[in-house]
Design a protein with these regions (language model features):
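Class I SAM-dependent methyltransferase SAM/SAH-binding core
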Residues: 64, 68-107
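N-terminal auxiliary segments of SAM/dcSAM-dependent transferases
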Residues: 1-20
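Conserved alpha-helix/loop element of class I SAM-dependent methyltransferases that forms part
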Residues: 42-59
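A short glycine-rich, Lys/Arg-flanked "PGG" loop and its adjoining helix->strand segment in the class I
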Residues: 130-142
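Short alpha-helix
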Residues: 154-169, 175-176
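A conserved beta-strand element that flanks and buttresses the S-adenosyl-L-methionine
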Residues: 118
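Conserved beta-strand signature within the Rossmann-like core of class I S-adenosyl-L-methionine
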Residues: 140-151
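Conserved Class I S-adenosyl-L-methionine
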Residues: 180-239
């Protein structure tokens, strides 16, 4: 069995480890969208990608996948006939993606033009003002699937994100709240972390304290979602 999590970084290597041993493989790093409690995590993650793909113009539109993850979505876009490229500041992600991937921060990326920019859980790592200032120069459309905080202090806030978009000439063409479909992803890992404690320590070199921290954070994140402090949304922004 290939064990790619051994070459990845914390904490994503933890989630990759659990997916590999629970599901037999890991294709995605993003949240799943659960329709039923008995959905598999793989089916839920695939549903998330399908939702994103359903909003795209037909091939051969030119797309930039910002973040790339493991490269699964980028490879699929290429197979579908899109002129698709990826960008990530992380060399390990780029190596795993093995596609047309530039290793660079999005904020200074000088490429394009593109028809659509895709942010599948990558917008949260980029300052919102910088994101839309750069997006304005690259494409007329930004498609986002990500989590947001409602109040400041957890991560980028939804209001600040929309304000930055508007300041750079983007308007919301579509918005879908998927929070309750995404939340079971947190519960999936939260339920399995205690079971994999010793394996994570042995395989990844984690400490008991790190595993305890992940378990505690899982509880906090679950509460954030079910209390409405965190939301998960699809946003289609155009200018």
């Amino acid at each position: 069995m290939s064990l790619p999590y051994r070459d990845f970084y914390y904490p994503l290597n933890v989630f990759m480890h659990i997916l590999t041993h629970e599901e037999g493989a890991v294709r995605y790093l993003h949240y799943g969208l659960f329709e039923r409690p008995d959905d598999s995590i793989d089916a839920a993650q695939e549903r998330s990608t399908e939702l994103l793909l359903s909003r795209l113009p037909p091939p051969p539109a030119r797309l930039l996948d910002v973040g790339v993850g493991l490269g699964t979505t980028l490879a699929r876009l290429t197979r579908l006939g899109y002129d698709a490229e990826g960008i990530t500041p992380d060399e390990k992600q780029a190596a795993m993606a093995r596609g047309r991937v530039t290793v660079a921060p999005f904020e200074t990326f000088d490429g394009g033009p593109y028809d659509v920019l895709l942010f599948q859980e990558s917008s949260q790592y980029i300052d919102s003002d910088a994101l839309f200032a750069r997006a304005r120069a690259l494409a007329p459309r930004v498609l986002v699937l990500d989590e947001f905080a409602i109040e400041p202090g957890i991560m980028h806030t939804y209001d600040d994100f929309l304000h930055a978009a508007a300041e750079n000439g983007f308007r919301v063409a579509e918005e879908i709240d998927l929070s309750m479909k995404a939340a079971p992803t947190v519960d999936y890992f939260r339920a399995r972390l205690p079971r994999y404690r010793q394996a994570l320590i042995a395989d990844l070199g984690l400490t008991d304290q790190q595993v305890d921290h992940l378990i505690a954070n899982g509880e906090i994140y679950s509460n954030y979602y079910y209390s409405g402090a965190l939301v998960y949304r699809l946003l289609d922004l155009t200018r």
